[in-house]
Swiss-Prot record:
FMN binds at residues 127-129, 247-248, 291, 306-310, 332. This is Chorismate synthase. One of its GO terms (cellular component) is cytosol. One of its GO terms (biological process) is chorismate biosynthetic process. It is an enzyme of class 4 (lyase).
Length: 381
Protein backbone atom coordinates (compact mmCIF):
# COMPACT_ATOMS: atom_id res chain seq x y z
CA UNK A 1 0.00 0.00 0.00
CA UNK A 2 1.21 3.54 -0.73
CA UNK A 3 0.83 6.52 1.56
CA UNK A 4 -2.09 8.89 1.79
CA UNK A 5 -3.27 11.44 4.31
CA UNK A 6 -6.15 13.77 5.09
CA UNK A 7 -5.93 16.86 7.28
CA UNK A 8 -8.48 19.18 8.86
CA UNK A 9 -8.43 22.27 11.00
CA UNK A 10 -8.38 26.05 10.88
CA UNK A 11 -5.64 28.54 11.72
CA UNK A 12 -7.32 29.67 14.94
CA UNK A 13 -9.48 26.61 15.56
CA UNK A 14 -8.88 24.19 18.43
CA UNK A 15 -6.43 21.97 16.56
CA UNK A 16 -4.98 20.78 13.29
CA UNK A 17 -5.54 17.06 12.82
CA UNK A 18 -4.40 14.41 10.36
CA UNK A 19 -4.93 10.76 9.54
CA UNK A 20 -2.17 9.00 7.59
CA UNK A 21 -2.46 5.53 6.10
CA UNK A 22 0.07 3.21 4.52
CA UNK A 23 3.04 3.27 6.87
CA UNK A 24 4.49 -0.22 7.29
CA UNK A 25 4.57 -1.82 10.71
CA UNK A 26 7.73 -1.77 12.76
CA UNK A 27 8.86 1.81 12.13
CA UNK A 28 10.22 3.45 15.30
CA UNK A 29 9.00 7.04 15.65
CA UNK A 30 11.17 9.51 17.53
CA UNK A 31 8.58 11.85 19.04
CA UNK A 32 11.25 14.41 19.88
CA UNK A 33 12.36 14.44 16.22
CA UNK A 34 8.77 15.16 15.16
CA UNK A 35 8.48 18.02 17.64
CA UNK A 36 11.92 19.29 16.66
CA UNK A 37 10.74 19.71 13.07
CA UNK A 38 7.68 21.55 14.37
CA UNK A 39 9.94 23.92 16.29
CA UNK A 40 12.10 24.40 13.20
CA UNK A 41 8.99 25.48 11.29
CA UNK A 42 8.35 28.17 13.89
CA UNK A 43 11.85 29.66 13.60
CA UNK A 44 13.23 32.28 11.26
CA UNK A 45 14.09 35.95 11.10
CA UNK A 46 11.03 37.92 10.02
CA UNK A 47 8.36 35.72 11.60
CA UNK A 48 5.29 37.33 13.20
CA UNK A 49 3.78 37.36 16.67
CA UNK A 50 1.87 34.07 16.31
CA UNK A 51 5.08 32.08 16.74
CA UNK A 52 5.57 33.64 20.18
CA UNK A 53 2.23 32.22 21.27
CA UNK A 54 2.43 28.67 19.94
CA UNK A 55 4.68 25.90 21.23
CA UNK A 56 3.88 23.27 18.64
CA UNK A 57 4.00 19.59 19.53
CA UNK A 58 2.33 16.57 17.95
CA UNK A 59 -0.05 14.43 19.97
CA UNK A 60 -0.32 10.93 18.50
CA UNK A 61 -3.74 9.40 18.93
CA UNK A 62 -3.64 6.11 16.99
CA UNK A 63 -1.49 3.85 14.85
CA UNK A 64 1.49 3.49 17.19
CA UNK A 65 2.20 1.38 20.23
CA UNK A 66 5.25 2.01 22.34
CA UNK A 67 6.57 4.47 19.79
CA UNK A 68 6.44 1.97 16.90
CA UNK A 69 3.99 1.90 13.99
CA UNK A 70 1.52 -0.98 13.94
CA UNK A 71 0.49 -0.79 10.29
CA UNK A 72 -2.85 0.78 11.22
CA UNK A 73 -3.81 4.35 10.24
CA UNK A 74 -1.94 6.98 12.23
CA UNK A 75 -3.91 9.83 13.79
CA UNK A 76 -2.30 12.93 15.26
CA UNK A 77 -3.14 16.46 16.36
CA UNK A 78 -1.27 19.73 16.76
CA UNK A 79 -3.16 21.95 19.19
CA UNK A 80 -3.55 25.70 18.67
CA UNK A 81 -2.84 27.64 21.87
CA UNK A 82 -4.00 30.82 20.16
CA UNK A 83 -7.51 29.36 19.86
CA UNK A 84 -8.21 30.62 23.37
CA UNK A 85 -7.89 34.18 22.06
CA UNK A 86 -10.17 33.50 19.08
CA UNK A 87 -12.75 31.05 20.41
CA UNK A 88 -15.59 33.58 20.23
CA UNK A 89 -14.80 34.28 16.57
CA UNK A 90 -13.75 30.84 15.30
CA UNK A 91 -15.96 28.17 16.82
CA UNK A 92 -17.61 25.06 15.35
CA UNK A 93 -20.70 25.87 17.42
CA UNK A 94 -21.39 29.58 16.90
CA UNK A 95 -20.62 32.51 14.61
CA UNK A 96 -19.55 35.85 15.98
CA UNK A 97 -17.35 38.86 15.52
CA UNK A 98 -16.80 41.28 12.68
CA UNK A 99 -17.03 39.85 9.19
CA UNK A 100 -13.88 39.81 7.09
CA UNK A 101 -14.90 41.53 3.84
CA UNK A 102 -11.83 43.62 2.91
CA UNK A 103 -10.37 40.78 0.87
CA UNK A 104 -6.59 40.72 0.45
CA UNK A 105 -4.89 40.62 -2.96
CA UNK A 106 -2.64 37.59 -3.26
CA UNK A 107 -4.70 35.48 -0.85
CA UNK A 108 -7.53 32.98 -1.31
CA UNK A 109 -10.03 35.44 0.23
CA UNK A 110 -11.90 36.71 -2.83
CA UNK A 111 -11.95 33.60 -5.00
CA UNK A 112 -12.85 31.37 -2.05
CA UNK A 113 -15.68 33.61 -0.84
CA UNK A 114 -17.20 33.86 -4.30
CA UNK A 115 -16.75 30.15 -5.03
CA UNK A 116 -18.53 29.04 -1.85
CA UNK A 117 -21.12 31.82 -1.67
CA UNK A 118 -19.76 33.29 1.57
CA UNK A 119 -20.31 36.78 2.94
CA UNK A 120 -17.36 36.44 5.32
CA UNK A 121 -13.89 35.57 3.98
CA UNK A 122 -12.93 34.41 7.47
CA UNK A 123 -14.25 30.97 6.50
CA UNK A 124 -11.72 30.88 3.63
CA UNK A 125 -8.64 32.40 5.21
CA UNK A 126 -8.79 30.22 8.31
CA UNK A 127 -8.33 27.07 6.24
CA UNK A 128 -6.10 28.63 3.56
CA UNK A 129 -3.65 29.89 6.18
CA UNK A 130 -0.11 28.52 6.22
CA UNK A 131 -0.78 27.59 9.85
CA UNK A 132 -2.07 24.32 8.37
CA UNK A 133 1.49 23.40 7.44
CA UNK A 134 2.21 22.56 11.08
CA UNK A 135 0.42 19.24 10.75
CA UNK A 136 2.01 18.69 7.31
CA UNK A 137 5.43 19.03 8.95
CA UNK A 138 4.45 16.40 11.53
CA UNK A 139 3.42 14.03 8.74
CA UNK A 140 6.64 14.81 6.90
CA UNK A 141 8.63 13.84 9.98
CA UNK A 142 7.04 10.39 9.80
CA UNK A 143 7.99 10.15 6.13
CA UNK A 144 11.55 11.18 6.99
CA UNK A 145 11.70 8.39 9.57
CA UNK A 146 10.67 5.83 6.95
CA UNK A 147 13.20 7.17 4.45
CA UNK A 148 15.96 7.23 7.06
CA UNK A 149 15.28 3.57 7.87
CA UNK A 150 16.29 2.86 4.25
CA UNK A 151 19.33 5.15 4.20
CA UNK A 152 17.69 8.24 2.68
CA UNK A 153 18.16 11.64 4.35
CA UNK A 154 16.33 14.90 3.57
CA UNK A 155 17.46 18.43 4.38
CA UNK A 156 17.12 22.00 3.09
CA UNK A 157 18.85 25.36 2.76
CA UNK A 158 17.53 28.87 2.07
CA UNK A 159 19.19 30.12 -1.13
CA UNK A 160 17.51 33.49 -1.70
CA UNK A 161 15.88 36.35 0.16
CA UNK A 162 14.69 39.07 -2.17
CA UNK A 163 17.08 39.59 -5.11
CA UNK A 164 20.19 38.23 -3.32
CA UNK A 165 20.64 34.53 -4.07
CA UNK A 166 23.17 31.71 -4.20
CA UNK A 167 23.28 28.55 -6.32
CA UNK A 168 24.99 25.69 -4.45
CA UNK A 169 25.17 22.53 -6.57
CA UNK A 170 25.54 19.93 -3.81
CA UNK A 171 23.76 19.00 -0.58
CA UNK A 172 25.22 20.58 2.55
CA UNK A 173 27.92 18.68 4.41
CA UNK A 174 27.28 17.65 8.03
CA UNK A 175 29.16 20.74 9.23
CA UNK A 176 27.16 22.95 6.88
CA UNK A 177 23.93 21.37 8.08
CA UNK A 178 24.85 22.25 11.66
CA UNK A 179 25.45 25.85 10.59
CA UNK A 180 22.16 25.93 8.70
CA UNK A 181 20.23 24.69 11.72
CA UNK A 182 21.92 27.26 13.96
CA UNK A 183 21.04 30.12 11.60
CA UNK A 184 17.88 32.20 11.97
CA UNK A 185 17.78 32.36 8.16
CA UNK A 186 18.51 28.66 7.55
CA UNK A 187 21.75 29.27 5.65
CA UNK A 188 25.40 28.37 6.30
CA UNK A 189 26.83 31.78 5.33
CA UNK A 190 26.61 34.36 8.12
CA UNK A 191 27.74 37.26 5.93
CA UNK A 192 24.93 36.48 3.50
CA UNK A 193 22.47 36.09 6.39
CA UNK A 194 23.41 39.59 7.57
CA UNK A 195 22.58 40.98 4.11
CA UNK A 196 19.26 39.16 4.17
CA UNK A 197 18.38 40.47 7.64
CA UNK A 198 18.95 44.00 6.38
CA UNK A 199 16.55 43.36 3.48
CA UNK A 200 13.93 41.99 5.86
CA UNK A 201 14.35 44.91 8.25
CA UNK A 202 13.90 47.37 5.39
CA UNK A 203 10.65 45.71 4.31
CA UNK A 204 9.38 45.61 7.88
CA UNK A 205 10.09 49.33 8.27
CA UNK A 206 7.96 50.19 5.26
CA UNK A 207 5.16 47.79 6.13
CA UNK A 208 5.93 45.31 3.38
CA UNK A 209 7.06 41.72 2.99
CA UNK A 210 9.77 39.84 1.12
CA UNK A 211 10.03 36.40 -0.49
CA UNK A 212 12.86 34.14 -1.56
CA UNK A 213 13.77 30.56 -2.39
CA UNK A 214 15.03 27.37 -0.79
CA UNK A 215 16.57 24.11 -1.94
CA UNK A 216 15.49 20.68 -0.66
CA UNK A 217 17.96 17.81 -0.94
CA UNK A 218 17.70 14.05 -0.52
CA UNK A 219 20.69 11.71 -0.42
CA UNK A 220 20.83 7.90 -0.54
CA UNK A 221 18.01 7.49 -3.05
CA UNK A 222 18.07 4.32 -5.17
CA UNK A 223 17.87 4.55 -8.95
CA UNK A 224 14.36 4.14 -10.35
CA UNK A 225 11.87 5.71 -7.92
CA UNK A 226 9.01 7.19 -9.93
CA UNK A 227 8.17 6.22 -13.50
CA UNK A 228 8.39 7.37 -17.10
CA UNK A 229 5.22 5.66 -18.31
CA UNK A 230 2.51 8.22 -17.36
CA UNK A 231 2.70 11.94 -16.55
CA UNK A 232 1.08 11.51 -13.13
CA UNK A 233 3.65 8.90 -12.13
CA UNK A 234 6.67 11.03 -12.95
CA UNK A 235 8.42 11.86 -9.71
CA UNK A 236 9.48 15.32 -10.88
CA UNK A 237 5.84 16.19 -11.59
CA UNK A 238 4.75 14.89 -8.20
CA UNK A 239 7.46 16.80 -6.36
CA UNK A 240 6.65 20.00 -8.24
CA UNK A 241 2.96 19.57 -7.44
CA UNK A 242 3.65 18.89 -3.77
CA UNK A 243 5.83 21.98 -3.43
CA UNK A 244 3.43 24.21 -5.36
CA UNK A 245 0.73 23.00 -2.97
CA UNK A 246 2.54 24.76 -0.13
CA UNK A 247 1.13 28.22 0.55
CA UNK A 248 2.99 31.04 -1.29
CA UNK A 249 5.16 28.74 -3.44
CA UNK A 250 4.92 30.02 -7.02
CA UNK A 251 7.57 28.09 -8.94
CA UNK A 252 9.69 24.94 -8.67
CA UNK A 253 13.02 24.09 -10.31
CA UNK A 254 14.51 20.60 -10.63
CA UNK A 255 18.30 20.63 -10.61
CA UNK A 256 19.58 23.31 -12.99
CA UNK A 257 16.21 23.43 -14.72
CA UNK A 258 16.14 27.19 -15.32
CA UNK A 259 19.62 27.21 -16.87
CA UNK A 260 18.27 26.25 -20.29
CA UNK A 261 20.51 28.71 -22.12
CA UNK A 262 23.39 26.28 -21.80
CA UNK A 263 24.28 23.96 -24.69
CA UNK A 264 23.36 20.33 -24.20
CA UNK A 265 26.86 19.15 -23.37
CA UNK A 266 26.92 21.61 -20.46
CA UNK A 267 23.40 20.78 -19.26
CA UNK A 268 23.32 16.97 -19.01
CA UNK A 269 25.31 14.56 -16.83
CA UNK A 270 27.60 11.94 -18.40
CA UNK A 271 27.12 8.38 -17.07
CA UNK A 272 29.96 6.27 -15.63
CA UNK A 273 30.17 2.82 -14.05
CA UNK A 274 32.57 0.83 -11.96
CA UNK A 275 32.04 -2.47 -10.10
CA UNK A 276 32.42 -0.93 -6.66
CA UNK A 277 30.22 2.16 -7.08
CA UNK A 278 27.80 1.00 -9.73
CA UNK A 279 26.45 3.79 -11.95
CA UNK A 280 27.57 7.32 -11.10
CA UNK A 281 27.92 10.86 -12.48
CA UNK A 282 30.62 13.50 -12.14
CA UNK A 283 27.98 16.24 -12.27
CA UNK A 284 24.39 16.51 -11.06
CA UNK A 285 22.79 19.16 -13.24
CA UNK A 286 19.64 17.03 -13.49
CA UNK A 287 19.18 17.30 -9.74
CA UNK A 288 18.88 13.54 -9.30
CA UNK A 289 15.91 13.09 -11.65
CA UNK A 290 15.83 11.94 -15.27
CA UNK A 291 12.77 10.81 -17.21
CA UNK A 292 10.55 11.14 -14.15
CA UNK A 293 12.75 8.79 -12.08
CA UNK A 294 15.57 9.08 -9.58
CA UNK A 295 18.98 8.50 -11.20
CA UNK A 296 20.97 7.66 -8.07
CA UNK A 297 22.41 11.13 -7.57
CA UNK A 298 21.29 13.44 -4.74
CA UNK A 299 17.91 15.05 -5.29
CA UNK A 300 18.02 18.85 -5.56
CA UNK A 301 14.76 20.76 -5.90
CA UNK A 302 14.32 24.53 -5.58
CA UNK A 303 11.07 26.24 -4.58
CA UNK A 304 10.36 29.95 -5.01
CA UNK A 305 8.21 31.69 -2.39
CA UNK A 306 6.38 34.92 -3.16
CA UNK A 307 6.32 37.80 -0.66
CA UNK A 308 3.53 37.23 1.85
CA UNK A 309 0.55 39.29 0.62
CA UNK A 310 -0.67 40.37 4.07
CA UNK A 311 1.14 43.67 4.72
CA UNK A 312 0.92 46.55 7.19
CA UNK A 313 0.98 48.84 4.14
CA UNK A 314 -1.89 47.15 2.29
CA UNK A 315 -2.81 47.10 -1.37
CA UNK A 316 -6.05 48.45 -2.79
CA UNK A 317 -8.99 46.08 -2.88
CA UNK A 318 -12.80 45.93 -2.97
CA UNK A 319 -15.09 45.32 -0.02
CA UNK A 320 -16.85 42.00 -0.52
CA UNK A 321 -20.11 43.29 1.00
CA UNK A 322 -20.41 46.74 -0.60
CA UNK A 323 -18.24 46.32 -3.74
CA UNK A 324 -16.70 49.70 -2.82
CA UNK A 325 -13.00 50.44 -3.18
CA UNK A 326 -11.05 50.09 0.08
CA UNK A 327 -7.74 48.91 1.53
CA UNK A 328 -7.00 45.26 2.24
CA UNK A 329 -7.53 44.35 5.86
CA UNK A 330 -4.40 43.52 7.85
CA UNK A 331 -4.31 40.18 9.64
CA UNK A 332 -1.32 39.36 11.86
CA UNK A 333 1.38 37.97 9.60
CA UNK A 334 5.09 37.55 8.88
CA UNK A 335 7.45 39.85 7.01
CA UNK A 336 9.44 36.85 5.74
CA UNK A 337 8.74 33.14 6.19
CA UNK A 338 11.19 31.56 3.73
CA UNK A 339 13.16 29.66 6.43
CA UNK A 340 9.92 28.17 7.75
CA UNK A 341 8.80 27.31 4.21
CA UNK A 342 12.04 25.38 3.72
CA UNK A 343 11.08 23.08 6.60
CA UNK A 344 7.63 22.59 5.08
CA UNK A 345 9.36 21.90 1.76
CA UNK A 346 11.37 19.13 3.40
CA UNK A 347 8.14 17.61 4.70
CA UNK A 348 6.27 17.49 1.39
CA UNK A 349 9.33 16.26 -0.52
CA UNK A 350 9.91 13.55 2.08
CA UNK A 351 6.28 12.48 1.79
CA UNK A 352 6.47 12.10 -1.99
CA UNK A 353 9.78 10.24 -1.78
CA UNK A 354 8.46 7.88 0.89
CA UNK A 355 5.39 7.26 -1.24
CA UNK A 356 7.56 6.50 -4.28
CA UNK A 357 9.73 4.19 -2.18
CA UNK A 358 6.72 2.15 -1.06
CA UNK A 359 5.31 2.08 -4.59
CA UNK A 360 8.56 0.56 -5.79
CA UNK A 361 9.32 -1.82 -2.92
CA UNK A 362 6.03 -2.41 -1.07
CA UNK A 363 6.12 -4.26 2.21
CA UNK A 364 3.84 -4.61 5.23
CA UNK A 365 6.79 -4.20 7.58
CA UNK A 366 9.89 -2.02 7.57
CA UNK A 367 11.98 -5.20 7.36
CA UNK A 368 10.11 -6.26 4.20
CA UNK A 369 10.95 -2.90 2.63
CA UNK A 370 14.61 -3.16 3.65
CA UNK A 371 15.02 -6.61 2.09
CA UNK A 372 13.38 -5.49 -1.15
CA UNK A 373 15.63 -2.42 -1.35
CA UNK A 374 18.75 -4.52 -0.77
CA UNK A 375 17.75 -7.13 -3.37
CA UNK A 376 17.09 -4.43 -5.95
CA UNK A 377 20.40 -2.69 -5.24
CA UNK A 378 22.24 -5.98 -5.80
CA UNK A 379 20.38 -6.62 -9.07
CA UNK A 380 21.13 -3.27 -10.71
CA UNK A 381 24.78 -2.97 -9.72
Amino acid sequence: MTLRYLTAGESHGPALVAIAEGFPAGLPVDFEAVDRDLRRRQKGYGRGGRMKIETDAAQFLAGLRGGVTTGAPIALAVWNKDHENWKDLVSPYARGGRKFTQVRPGHADLAGALKYGLDDARDVLERASARSTAVIVALGALAKALLSSQGVEVCSRVVAIGPRDIRPDAPPTPAQRDAIEASDLHVDDEALAAEWRALIDAEKARGGSIGGAFDVYATGLPIGLGSHVHPDRRLDARLAGALCGVQAIRAVEIGDGTQVGRPGYEFHDAIHHDPARGFWRETNRAGGLEGGMTDGMPLRVRAYMKPIPTMLHPLATVDLATRAATQARYERSDVCAVPAAAVVGEAVVAWELANALLEKFGGDTVEDVRRAVEAYAARIR
